[in-house]
Amino acid sequence: MSLTTEGEALCQHADGLLDRFAALETELADRQNALNGTVRIAATFGFGRRWLGPALAAFQAQHPALQVELQLTEQLPDLGIQGYDGAIWLWSVQNRHASDWVTRRIARNQRVLAASPAYLQRRGLPADLPALATHDCLVARENGGAQPRPFDLWTLRHARDGSTARIRVQGALASNSGEMVRDWCLDGRGIMLRSLWDIAPQLASGELVRVLPHYAMPEADIHWVAPWRPRTPRRVRLLIDFLVEAFRTEPWKLEAPARPKPRRAKA
């Protein structure tokens, strides 16, 4: 069974009318001074719990008539079908050119190598990437997609010359929980690759130490991600502006603490 040419034209016209009605509904709602309605957002567990949750609570306190719903998940949901306004997600360079997505960067996401002083005293500080490959590394298998990903293959960029290298790491411990990997690292079980927003307090206190500090993972920054719509509600636009301003100074980014001097590992 298939539509006639006239039927296809009618369906396309109907789709256009629905978009216009949705835009008109949003425009009428925006004329209200006070924000109301519901904003529904998805985010990853780590950033959602540690940083996004408090920011959303602060925004809602400024707009008491507004409802905010935060869904924490490790898989990016189908935002349009499941009724989300958008998601706060790590969005890599490869994703940014997708025409059916609307994105805005919320914060920079720098991922660095770190270990505990106890581990470095026991195993030594790796002098270069080949030496890193001989160490116990803690692998986080987070945010997996439909396609399998080699989580033990780390891509690292040199801060000075911008060169990148891929290194396959080894280690006996891996988890789909970033918090678990961080706990293992604090317990002296190996070297991990984590976001600064996740471990800045431990770096500042000296519980963790940067390893190979001139290297970091190429950035997949934290973005507002949403499917394209004819018009974005005012409550959503103001929330995005609020989050950009809240994280503009990267509140987790602290001055690097004085580093202990563990012995260097032999190459």
Where are these regions (language model features)?
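Hydrophobic hinge/microswitch elements
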Residues: 163-210, 216-218, 224, 240
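Short, well-ordered beta-strand segments
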Residues: 40-42, 87, 138, 192, ...
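Acidic, Gly/Pro-rich loop/turn segments at junctions of secondary structure
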Residues: 71-175
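Short secondary-structure boundary segments
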Residues: 91, 117, 196-197, 215
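Central regulatory/effector-binding core of bacterial HTH transcription factors
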Residues: 36-99, 257-267
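Basic, amphipathic "hinge/linker" alpha-helix immediately C-terminal to the N-terminal HTH DNA-binding motif
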Residues: 1-20
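C-terminal effector-binding regulatory domain of bacterial HTH transcription factors
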Residues: 12, 61, 65, 197-201, ...
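Hydrophobic residues within well-ordered alpha-helices
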Residues: 4-7, 79, 132, 183-188, ...
